[in-house]
Amino acid sequence: MEPSGSEQLFEDPDPGGKSQDAEARKQTESEQKLSKMTHNALENINVIGQGLKHLFQHQRRRSSVSPHDVQQIQADPEPEMDLESQNACAEIDGVPTHPTALNRVLQQIRVPPKMKRGTSLHSRRGKPEAPKGSPQINRKSGQEMTAVMQSGRPRSSSTTDAPTSSAMMEIACAAAAAAAACLPGEEGTAERIERLEVSSLAQTSSAVASSTDGSIHTDSVDGTPDPQRTKAAIAHLQQKILKLTEQIKIAQTARDDNVAEYLKLANSADKQQAARIKQVFEKKNQKSAQTILQLQKKLEHYHRKLREVEQNGIPRQPKDVFRDMHQGLKDVGAKVTGFSEGVVDSVKGGFSSFSQATHSAAGAVVSKPREIASLIRNKFGSADNIPNLKDSLEEGQVDDAGKALGVISNFQSSPKYGSEEDCSSATSGSVGANSTTGGIAVGASSSKTNTLDMQSSGFDALLHEIQEIRETQARLEESFETLKEHYQRDYSLIMQTLQEERYRCERLEEQLNDLTELHQNEILNLKQELASMEEKIAYQSYERARDIQEALEACQTRISKMELQQQQQQVVQLEGLENATARNLLGKLINILLAVMAVLLVFVSTVANCVVPLMKTRNRTFSTLFLVVFIAFLWKHWDALFSYVERFFSSPR
């Protein structure tokens, strides 16, 4: 199932980051669409001016048609009609249709048919199939047909005609084309602008038909949007806009924090760390810039959607549209049955002039010649056969309703009609295609009998045509005002778009200025770092050179000391060679002294070895000391003792 218009409004745009080439391509496409819209506006204004010119240059011409022209009418219409039908249908296929225009057409279809006097149940019988006739209006055949009908009708007849089934079939085909055109899946911004333009033009159009009292009126249907869905869509879009605004603020704050952190780290980092920090910061900065750009695109998109919803509203969903279309097509069947009323009443009627009122694609001024019924009655014998013929003609109109749109488009865009009299032709293509042969032939035969009646009713027809011209002028003024409002809306939309682009350019300039300042700060920081590095390198090189110089001086002093020591050793060696003999003698003397000292040491050691056992313990020590003291005492008093001993031993003798 295809998405509705409101569901398309809520779809998020494609958030993928695009390259600059894609953005430039989108800008050029949008500019092309705007230029195309302006060109279409100028063409529509030219069409309105041409219609006003035709209105005020209205002239009525009366001419007769020869039998040769009647035969040429019978032979020529089909190829020209087919060619114009193909061109007009091709033009309609290329024009996008807005759902608002579709609602207008559907409501036009749903208008109940007006029942006139003279309608019988016989006109509602089953309709036999009739050969299809082209509903296209050929310029040449239309003028000749007008001449024949004017020559063959009574002048006393009025121009009160009913809305024809051809117009109803044209409206039904317009509804089908609008339903087929309003179901695309996704559209770009430029396509939505173009669709808005077409829908606004469709709103200014009106389906023109003949009323019961003979006055020409337009049934313009007011396509009012659904207020509840519009309010819900506006609230939803406002919530999304607020959310995106907060996200943009958060992203900008995070980017500013990253910049401050980068500057802080870059000032207190060495060369390698600064390079790594710079790479990380550039990645983060690019990512944050892309995120902010995407969020800004989304915000602009939602602002555009909000303005569109506030201006145009939300149309109904396709389900309701197709249901109303089905009901409208059923009502078309009822309207088709009302065609007999206009045919029966047209016995007394006349043929009035046709003027192109507006460039609208949904309406056309339709008037049926009343003398067709009298001609058919003269051919078939009575008016009872008219409903049967009318039913077959209506079946042909239903089959060829698609070609009727070609007539409307041809009248809208073709400036070949020089005056309103040129446009005064039979717009009911099916009747003209199915009953041209018999009607024209009989009309030519009865043209002489109705000359007096034509002269008597000329004044009434002229007054009626003046009234129609006034009504047409009023409708043209309304259409002009509506078109003026439409172009004012387009102008305001273009100005809003320009303001958005200006705001976007200002934002881009601010971002560019921020990036430029950031790059300048980075360059200044790099210059400062380079200057500090130069100072550090110069100081370190000076310190190292001084250390090397000091080391060289120390090496030189050491080398000089070693040279002096070597010289002193050489001097000592030379003096030693001179005193070699003295040295030998001195050596021998020293050896003798060493030998004496060795003997003494041996003696002392022997005495010590003898004394040591006597002094190992305390008792031995005291005993040894007592013995030494005693020996010393004896040695000191040896003479006395020796004398005493001698006396001791000598006394007994």
Curated annotation (Swiss-Prot):
It is a multi-pass membrane protein. The modification Phosphoserine is found at residues 382, 414. Pfam families: Tmemb_cc2. Residues 64-74, 135-144, 204-218, 424-437 have a biased composition (Polar residues). It comes from the Eukaryota. GO terms for biological process: endoplasmic reticulum organization; endosomal transport; endosome fission; endosome membrane tubulation; membrane fission. GO terms for molecular function: identical protein binding. The chain crosses the membrane at residues 592-612, 625-645. Keywords: Acetylation, Coiled coil, Endoplasmic reticulum, Membrane, Phosphoprotein, Transmembrane, Transmembrane helix, Transport. Residues 113-125 have a biased composition (Basic residues). One of its GO terms (cellular component) is endoplasmic reticulum-endosome membrane contact site. Residues 1-591, 646-653 are cytoplasmic. The modification N-acetylmethionine is found at residue 1. It is found in: Endoplasmic reticulum membrane. Residues 153-165 have a biased composition (Low complexity). Residues 20-34 have a biased composition (Basic and acidic residues). Residues 228-313, 458-576 form a coiled coil. Residues 1-35, 58-78, 112-165, 204-227, 415-437 are annotated as: Disordered. InterPro entries: TEX28/TMCC (IPR019394). Endoplasmic reticulum membrane protein that promotes endoplasmic reticulum-associated endosome fission. Localizes to contact sites between the endoplasmic reticulum and endosomes and acts by promoting recruitment of the endoplasmic reticulum to endosome tubules for fission. Endosome membrane fission of early and late endosomes is essential to separate regions destined for lysosomal degradation from carriers to be recycled to the plasma membrane. Belongs to the TEX28 family. May form homodimers and heterodimers with TMCC2 or TMCC3 via the coiled-coil domains. Interacts with ribosomal proteins RPL4 and RPS6. This is Transmembrane and coiled-coil domains protein 1. It comes from Homo sapiens.
